[in-house]
């Protein structure tokens, strides 16, 4: 039999570290809605996904299957293997995400304001949950508007009408129309960027087509 040498005897025992893992999304039992509407950003750089859940993996007790928070995950187009960021703090799970199709000028930022993305323009999107709608902009990490108590059932879909009006529909059979204006002169989401101001040729061509839509004819 081979006798262990002194080096092997003095070598400390190595503990096997278990890599904690968890799911990213709710299953069909927990997500009791007809839809999971994810969407790409207007510039095509990232994808936002609803029905997401986040686990705090600091301890095994916290990482239990029933102990999670509702969130929305963002995936960058060049790396879809894992989320690049998340938007936590949702009271209930997200069912639908809808981007405003236009790009906007960035407002003057406060010194302590941390952007969600450092972009030369501002993008606006709405997140619908079972009982709320949260409107975000990419130049800040907190919502610019939170709307609640407007439906008796989960919100199934949303759409932007022009650049200031958001329409949401619910399983209760009703639609809600929300305007993003404080008064006649103040717009919550900012001023639209003119197509000719965009440096990216693909984006400029896309927004030139959007700019030709006459929304007054639809009223």
Predicted features along the sequence, with ranges:
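Blade-level signature of beta-propeller repeat domains, shared across WD40, Kelch, NHL, RCC1
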Residues: 159, 164-194
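WD40 beta-propeller repeat blades
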Residues: 1-81, 85-96, 179
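Conserved blade-ending motifs and adjacent loop-strand segments that build the rim/top face
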Residues: 26, 83-105, 142-162, 194-204
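Loop/turn segments within WD40 beta-propeller blades
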Residues: 30-32, 39-43, 99-104, 116-121, ...
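Beta-strand initiation motifs
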Residues: 79-83, 140-144, 184-189
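Hydrophobic beta-strand positions that form the internal "hydrophobic ladder"
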Residues: 47, 125, 166-167
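Conserved strand-to-loop turn within each blade of WD40 beta-propeller repeats
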Residues: 51-52, 68, 128-130, 169-172
């Amino acid at each position: 039999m081979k006798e262990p040498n002194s080096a092997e005897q003095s070598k400390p025992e190595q503990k096997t570290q278990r890599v904690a893992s968890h799911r990213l999304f709710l299953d069909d039992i927990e997500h009791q809605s007809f839809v999971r509407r994810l969407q790409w950003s207007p510039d095509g750089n990232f994808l936002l996904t609803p029905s997401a859940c986040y686990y705090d993996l600091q301890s095994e007790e916290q990482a239990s299957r029933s102990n999670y928070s509702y969130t929305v995950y963002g995936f960058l187009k060049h790396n879809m293997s894992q989320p690049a960021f998340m938007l936590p703090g949702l009271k209930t799970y997200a069912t639908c995400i809808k981007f405003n199709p236009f790009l906007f000028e960035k407002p003057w930022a406060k010194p302590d304001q941390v952007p969600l993305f450092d972009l030369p323009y501002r993008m606006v999107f709405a997140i619908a949950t079972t009982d709320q709608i949260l409107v975000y902009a990419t130049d800040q990490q907190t919502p610019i508007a939170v709307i609640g108590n407007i439906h008796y059932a989960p919100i199934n879909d949303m759409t932007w009408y022009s650049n200031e009006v958001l329409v949401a529909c619910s399983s209760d059979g009703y639609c809600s129309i929300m305007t993003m204006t404080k008064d006649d002169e103040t717009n919550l989401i900012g001023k639209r960027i003119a197509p000719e101001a965009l440096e990216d040729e693909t984006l400029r061509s896309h927004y030139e087509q959007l700019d030709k839509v006459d929304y007054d004819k639809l009223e």
